[in-house]
Amino acid sequence: MASLDDPGEVREGFLCPLCLKDLQSFYQLHSHYEEEHSGEDRDVKGQIKSLVQKAKKAKDRLLKREGDDRAESGTQGYESFSYGGVDPYMWEPQELGAVRSHLSDFKKHRAARIDHYVVEVNKLIIRLEKLTAFDRTNTESAKIRAIEKSVVPWVNDQDVPFCPDCGNKFSIRNRRHHCRLCGSIMCKKCMELISLPLANKLTSASKESLSTHTSPSQSPNSVHGSRRGSISSMSSVSSVLDEKDDDRIRCCTHCKDTLLKREQQIDEKEHTPDIVKLYEKLRLCMEKVDQKAPEYIRMAASLNAGETTYSLEHASDLRVEVQKVYELIDALSKKILTLGLNQDPPPHPSNLRLQRMIRYSATLFVQEKLLGLMSLPTKEQFEELKKKRKEEMERKRAVERQAALESQRRLEERQSGLASRAANGEVASLRRGPAPLRKAEGWLPLSGGQGQSEDSDPLLQQIHNITSFIRQAKAAGRMDEVRTLQENLRQLQDEYDQQQTEKAIELSRRQAEEEDLQREQLQMLRERELEREREQFRVASLHTRTRSLDFREIGPFQLEPSREPRTHLAYALDLGSSPVPSSTAPKTPSLSSTQPTRVWSGPPAVGQERLPQSSMPQQHEGPSLNPFDEEDLSSPMEEATTGPPAAGVSLDPSARILKEYNPFEEEDEEEEAVAGNPFIQPDSPAPNPFSEEDEHPQQRLSSPLVPGNPFEEPTCINPFEMDSDSGPEAEEPIEEELLLQQIDNIKAYIFDAKQCGRLDEVEVLTENLRELKHTLAKQKGGTD
């Protein structure tokens, strides 16, 4: 056995990289290195760490390959009995119960098994490499035997009396044979032989694998020696000699099985199945179709449109090429579908299912792409299409020229309009904002506010430039540049259309907002006006009802029973009195009732006032509209001297002009303030047929303001007092139509007061209605 100082020596086992001490396991080697060499150079430690990581990766790859083998062998049996005729996907979701993780135990057993397998394989590869490292043909048998004993220690013959495999007893006829790889003893029947080509194959594959993962710092000529074969590569490195003889290496059954499994892994790594080769060809054909089909579709669309960008012959050749590729795809997919069906061991069901799915996918691909291929026109059809295309282009150019002329004309008109407005001094108003957009014209102005032509748009200029570039590229025959420019032109056109659409949408939105704002303002004005009119109507209606229909305030006069009905009716029909404010309506007596009679010499009643002399002639300027007005004008003048003096009141001039309130007509705000003063007569005579007006206002300057009554004598001003010599014959009957009309009005007022919740007014109006009905019934009885 060579010494340790020999640079060509190959040692096996778990050797320390620093002291070359042989440890028995990987864990002992790791603990030895951490304890004995923890303070040494960290570079060597980094190299060892990288070596260990590589070994773990190689070990994982090996285990993955073995797991795939076991999965393939057990898939069929699992599919046959695991489900038991029940589809687990139809099960209801179940809640998880108690969970216990066995991952730690699994990792422990798995690591031990992997370590055992990897270590055993590495040992066998290293020993096999040593046995084939010398020339066995030119070496003496004694020297070969000595080398074989030096590779692995042999077991003593006396320790094994029987064969461990078959149990036969060793004798002179049944000799003992030692395994050259593990040193165990077996008989001739249980002995296996390894040929040199197989040994060279295993060692060469291990050498290639090691050369891929070995770090540059480690080499066979290292001072401390080298470890051929490691956990990371599952092999070792050795110099392989080309053996040409038929000599073989003896080994046991266990070592032979391990080496054969290693050979199977190498073959699987280098072997490519037939289905994979066919599928790779199929994918290449599909990729070729994906490249050629869009180009052909683009050429066919251009030729069918009558364009001369592409050649008809070139498109026909491309179509034939694409069709051939489709035929090849169909043939390859059929071959994959029938692959292995005639073999004696039939393929696995999963392989058959994979083949069917590949065929189905290829069929769908061909159908999808083949249906999208457009047919090419014939030469005669292509000539006709070119003529139509030429005519269409000419019409389009004519339309474009017409549009350009129209745009130029609009620009000139706009400029002339600007010049004329500038002469008239209107340029400042034009500069305040942009010109309004007319959608019918088909253009949009810029945000600067000045009218500009469509050609001033940068996008339009760029579109025109690219159009000219396309024409030049077509003339030069640069089809690739033509396609690029056409794509750019389409993008610019889309951008221009989007810009115009956004501007139109923004303009429409602004117009809609302005219209909504105007509509809201108009609605607010209408609501305010309606609210004002309602308030005026409510106040004036309340004043009119409480002043003209309050019959309970006649009590202070205490007239005779024979004259009471006429007096009440005359007061009820006195519509010429002015309304009073609503706050004092039920408490303040009316003007006609508070004024003293002409025969009363006492002081004036509360609230009795007299207007100034200057305002009296203005009260009766217009002619009276009352058909019952008396013609005798002497009585008011005679009675004016007997009336008591009234306290003068200084009133605002605006309060002297009053228009009679009509609940069915609208009034202004100015009239509402005047209508609330009980001491101001209206400017014009009231259109009340029961009010008496004097045609000569100059004769009543000193008399109190008492409205005329059509039921009193010309010599009497007070409607509640009559002469003693006048009897019942002096009464004039009231027209029945007027009484009925007043009754209907009071009913309407009662209904409105009930709706508004004015109960005090309801009581007053109800009593007045009762008295009017009584008067009407009495008058009808007297007439009858």
From Swiss-Prot:
Residue numbers carrying N-acetylalanine: 2
Location of the region described as Disordered in the Swiss-Prot/TrEMBL record: 207-241, 390-429, 574-732
Main location per the UniProt record: membrane
Subunit structure, interactors included: Interacts with EHD1, RAB4A, RAB5A, RAB14, RAB22A, RAB24 and VPS45. Binds simultaneously to RAB4A and RAB5A in vitro. Interacts with RAB4A and RAB5A that has been activated by GTP binding.
Domain of life: Eukaryota
Source species: Homo sapiens (Human)
PANTHER family linked to this entry: FYVE-FINGER-CONTAINING RAB5 EFFECTOR PROTEIN RABENOSYN-5-RELATED, RABENOSYN-5
Subcellular compartments: Cell membrane; Early endosome membrane
GO BP terms in the entry: early endosome to Golgi transport; endosomal transport; Golgi to lysosome transport; protein transport; regulation of Golgi organization
Gene3D superfamilies associated with the record: Rabenosyn, Rab binding domain, Zinc/RING finger domain, C3HC4 (zinc finger)
Region (Necessary for interaction with RAB5A): 627-784
Comp. bias (Low complexity): 228-240
Protein name in UniProt: Rabenosyn-5
